[in-house]
From Swiss-Prot:
Catalyzes the attachment of valine to tRNA(Val). As ValRS can inadvertently accommodate and process structurally similar amino acids such as threonine, to avoid such errors, it has a 'posttransfer' editing activity that hydrolyzes mischarged Thr-tRNA(Val) in a tRNA-dependent manner. A motif ('HIGH' region) lies at residues 40-50. It comes from Idiomarina loihiensis (strain ATCC BAA-735 / DSM 15497 / L2-TR). Monomer. GO terms for cellular component: cytosol. ValRS has two distinct active sites: one for aminoacylation and one for editing. The misactivated threonine is translocated from the active site to the editing site. Its EC number is 6.1.1.9. It comes from the Bacteria. Keywords: Aminoacyl-tRNA synthetase, ATP-binding, Coiled coil, Cytoplasm, Ligase, Nucleotide-binding, Protein biosynthesis. This is Valine--tRNA ligase. A motif ('KMSKS' region) lies at residues 553-557. It is found in: Cytoplasm.
Length: 949
């Protein structure tokens, strides 16, 4: 084996071999086990969140495959409506073209062209991560098969009266001119204002304090053109006498009523709220409660219309509303919403109706793609009536057919499902699944799988029909992911075998948008043999977010994004800066981002390889909590890979070209051999338990502890005295144990660290008589019954003796190479037997020149001592240390440690520092203070021991 472990030299070739040989395919044998990959956006590239989830899924898949299950990890990508359309529109814009000039069909062809060229980025990155997915079954949400499933679902839901078209309030992106989902809305905190406007009371009414007007407080004065009433709280005595009376709406000169509604917060502003149901979600609900009707004043680009749209509170069109014909003041027609705001405020001021303006910090909803404030907008959209489906989907989690890990996320799921609103599924885009609905010239709607089907079903002959221009929300097709990818609506063998799937690995942020909708759709359309609704998956493993080292969310605008491939391959500081500062939305951040990046990564990022990255992600995967990324852990696990590599080289050098007991079973196992076999067995048990309960962090800790501490640090050292001085039978036994434990350890580690384990295994397999092609298809280690528990106890006791001697060496600052005499008193028969039977291990690992039993402590000269149970260890100090010199050395160390303690204590007692420093900095300083206290205490104890000699 090469002297040093070089991931770059092995990873890509190995993956290609695995893929070419079809190892990722279901075996067709054993019980089925399936995981559906959450389909990443076809536009995207893998980020740390993907790397994290994919590591978890691949670990589970490889583990179950090795455990003999018929595993399918289903791969695919999402067409990502808005995101993809924008990418291609930007490319067109760079060539001076728009999609409108190109036309719908040509534009969609362009997107398919782009998808063929660039859609592969993400799949290549998945290969780099070692994802063992079945690439031959790769799906795309716009594939013909999946499109059939989407049309089928739409038609059936429509037939079941669960899909309807209606005019409702939606999040509208005026830049992209489409409805968008709540997930695509980003609330940004901004400095804004509250305007206090006077609305005159009609019919000579007066307020309690004799005023002839009410003052309304608003953050959106421009929407007053569409006001339908003013609301006050029913318990607000100031306005009780005015409920049911009227106001004169300024500028528009309409009479609007004063209503009482519990939604009003009497403490905010003046306690009087203007209500514009067509332009605010809360107002929409108030309008519905009071049947006020709605006045829509903006067009799709958020400009004021000359004539407002008038509607009932349920969305039916009206010619007039309470005598108002919809004509808006002409000075505002065609004005952009924020321009209209300025003009309206100025006009209120001129009319003497502007009471005051106050500064106010506001959360403004922005579209995450269009980058402009979202407008609540009344439009005709298609909706799914989800309440009936939600009941069934809630019950599936309540009765345990679906389990969330960790369980606390079930409450989040329930709170959404019990307050569920109808789902807006139409989008005003061109890229996506076009809605299978057609209109005749009279506006009648016909829903069907194809135009031919619609004509035939409704006897339309050659009546002109126009297909709906809109496409479906991307989440609509991804809600069908678990069954559409397996061939539904056909009843395929795959569907019968792999559905329901076993586990879904996903982020908490899409429990509602994706997980809940998958459960609803699947249970509505998939039935088992008894005709009972089928769930899409039995477990939902919910991951937290991966944040940067300071706990900040990773984002392009903050310039703190880490690319998993940069951890694998490495990147220079200059390249990293260039990457983080390219295409910034706010170019002024460039300098700040560069400064931060160079401070954090002065030398760039070194290559760590895929296995180190995967092991780090696994080790950080504590259930359901956000993870603060830690480069030091990554470096530590890169060292872990080196440790495994070097340990394997030692094993191979000690066993290749030697008899490892394959041909000759005349073997004697040492205590160390029996102990490591038993230790490994308990490691297998604990590791399996951790993976079976989704405690990936524990699994990583168990594997690390055994590999580094027990196998490398202890067992390999314990083999040296046997291999140097043991009998032929003993040497054969130790070599046999070395190769067999290493081979099984590689199998245990393989699901998390596939590359390094496969590479080493190929060298080890002939030594254990294995001729198979790959570690991937080897059985995962099982828990054995026939291990020696006595060997475990004996060896653990001997380790305590060795550690006690090493501690004395450390305390006395003695060279690790200096052989020491050991005197033992108070030894019972068991201790004596353990020492005498294992003198070679003790002498070698504790570096002893002699071992002698004495009758009592009185027979020992001046010594440093330690206790192991009742056994007392004495290391005579004569000739080993100069007492005075050692006391002087310790005194200097104590003074230095005391100085450091005083410095840190002073800093933390300084109120100025504590009040201004970030929490993370204070925590670090407290940690240092605690370490300084421990050091000081240890030095003082050591000084007392030397004085007592």
């Amino acid at each position: 084996m090469d002297k040093t472990y070089s991931p770059a030299a092995i990873e890509q070739d190995l993956y290609q071999q695995w893929e070419d040989k079809g190892y990722f395919k279901p075996s067709g044998k054993g019980d089925p086990y399936s995981i559906m990959i959450p389909p990443p956006n076809v536009t995207g590239s893998l980020h740390m969140g993907h790397a994290f989830q994919h590591t978890i899924m691949d670990t589970l898949t490889r583990y179950q495959r090795m455990d003999g299950l018929n595993t399918l990890w289903q791969v695919g990508s999402d067409h990502a409506g808005i995101a993809t359309q924008m990418v291609v529109e930007r490319q067109l814009a760079a060539q001076g073209q728009t999609r409108q000039e190109l036309g719908r069909d040509a534009f969609i062809d362009k997107i398919w062209e782009w998808k063929e060229q660039s859609g592969g980025t993400i799949t290549q990155q998945m290969r780099r991560l070692g994802d063992s997915v079945d690439w031959d079954r790769e799906r795309f949400t716009m594939d013909e098969g999946l499109s059939d499933a989407v049309r089928e679902v739409f038609v059936k839901l429509h037939e079941d009266n669960l899909i309807y078209r209606g005019k409702r309030l939606v999040n509208w992106d005026p830049a992209l001119q489409t409805a968008i989902s709540d997930l695509e809305v980003e609330n940004k905190e901004q400095q804004g204002y509250i305007w206090y406007l006077r609305y005159p009371l009609a019919d000579g009414e007066k307020t309690e304090d004799g005023k002839d007007h009410l003052v309304v407080a608003t953050t959106r004065p421009e929407t007053m053109l569409g006001d339908v009433c003013v609301a006050v709280h029913p318990d607000d005595e100031r306005f009780a006498h005015l409920v049911g009376k009227f106001l004169e709406l300024p500028i528009v000169n309409r009479r609007i009523p004063i209503v009482a509604d519990h939604h009003v917060d009497s403490e905010f502003g003046t306690g009087c709220v203007k209500v514009t149901p067509a332009h605010d979600f809360n107002d929409y609900e108030i309008g519905k409660r009071h049947q006020t009707g709605m006045i829509s004043i903006f067009d799709d680009t958020a400009h004021v219309m000359a004539k407002a749209g008038l509607y009932t509170s349920t969305g039916e069109t009206l010619e007039e509303l309470n005598g108002f014909n919809g004509i808006l003041p002409e000075q505002y027609a065609g004005k952009e919403r924020f321009e209209a705001r300025k003009q309206l405020v100025a006009e209120f001021d001129e009319l003497g109706l502007l009471e005051k303006i106050e500064k106010h910090t506001n959360k403004i909803p922005y579209g995450d793609r269009g980058g402009v404030p979202i407008e609540p907008h009344l439009t005709d959209q298609w909706y799914v009536r989800v309440e009936p489906m939600a009941k069934q989907a809630t019950a599936a989690v309540e009765d345990g057919r679906i389990e969330f890990v960790p369980k606390q996320y079930e409450n989040m799921y329930f709170s959404w499902m019990r307050d569920i609103q109808d789902w807006c599924i139409s989008r005003q885009l061109w890229w996506g699944h076009r809605i299978p609905a057609w209109y005749d010239e009279q506006g009648n709607v016909y829903v069907g799988r194809t135009e031919e089907e619609v004509r035939e079903k409704h006897n339309l002959g050659d009546t002109p029909l126009q297909q709906d221009e809109d496409v479906l929300d991307t989440w609509f097709s991804s809600a069908l992911w678990t069954f559409s990818t397996l061939g539904w609506p056909k009843n395929t063998e795959d569907l019968k075998t792999f559905h329901p799937t076993d586990v879904l690995v996903t982020g908490f942020d899409i429990i509602f948008f994706w997980v809940a909708r998958m459960i609803m759709m699947t249970m509505h359309f998939m039935k088992d043999e008894e005709g009972q609704p089928q769930v899409p998956f039995k477990k939902v493993y919910v991951t937290g977010l991966i944040r940067d080292e300071e706990g900040q969310k990773m984002s392009k605008s903050k310039g703190n994004v880490l690319d998993p491939l940069d951890m694998i391959d490495g990147i220079s500081a200059d390249e990293l800066v260039a990457k983080r500062t390219a295409n910034l939305m706010q170019p002024k951040m460039r300098e700040k981002i560069e400064k931060r990046t160079r401070k954090e990564f002065p030398e760039g990022i070194t290559a760590h390889g895929t296995d180190a990255l995967r092991f780090t992600l696994t080790a950080l995967a504590s259930t359901g909590r956000d993870i603060n990324w830690d480069m030091k852990r990554l470096e530590g696990y890169r060292n872990f890979c080196n440790k495994l590599w070097n340990a394997s080289r030692y094993v191979l050098m000690s066993t290749e070209e030697h008899d490892c007991g394959l041909e000759n079973d005349d073997m004697t196992l040492s205590l160390a051999d029996e102990w490591i076999i038993a230790r490994f067995n308990s490691t297998v048990k604990d590791f399996r338990q951790a993976l079976d309960t989704y405690r990936f962090d524990q699994a990583a800790a168990i594997a690390y502890e055994f590999t580094w501490n027990q196998f490398c640090d202890w067992y390999l050292e314990l083999t040296k005295p046997v291999l140097q001085n043991g009998t032929e039978s003993q040497q054969r036994g130790t070599r046999h144990t070395l190769v067999n434990v290493l081979e099984q350890l590689l199998r245990l580690l393989h699901p998390v660290m596939p590359y390094i384990t496969e590479t080493i295994w190929q060298r080890v397999k002939p030594l254990v008589g294995n001729t198979d092609d790959t570690i991937m298809l080897q059985p995962f280690p099982r828990v054995e019954d026939n291990v020696s528990h006595q060997a475990m106890q004996d060896m653990e006791w001997l380790k305590r003796v060795i550690l006690a001697i090493r501690n004395i060496r450390g305390e006395m600052d003695l060279s690790p190479n200096k052989p020491l005499p050991l005197l033992l008193s108070n030894a019972d028969a068991m201790a004596k037997g353990r020492i005498q039977n294992n003198e070679s291990f003790l002498s070698s690992l504790a570096k002893l020149e002699s071992i002698e039993f004495i009758e009592s402590d009185d027979d020992a000269p001046a010594s440093m001592t330690a206790l192991v149970d009742t056994l007392k260890l004495h290391i005579p100090m004569a000739g080993l240390i100069d007492k005075e010199a050692e006391l002087q050395r310790l005194q200097k160390s104590i003074e230095k440690a005391n100085k450091e303690w005083q410095r840190l204590n002073g800093k933390l007692s300084n109120d100025n520092f504590v009040s201004k420093a970030p929490e993370a900095v204070i925590a670090k300083e407290r940690e240092k203070l605690s370490e300084a206290e421990t050091t000081l205490k240890q030095l003082q104890e050591q000084q007392d021991k030397i004085k007592a000699l």
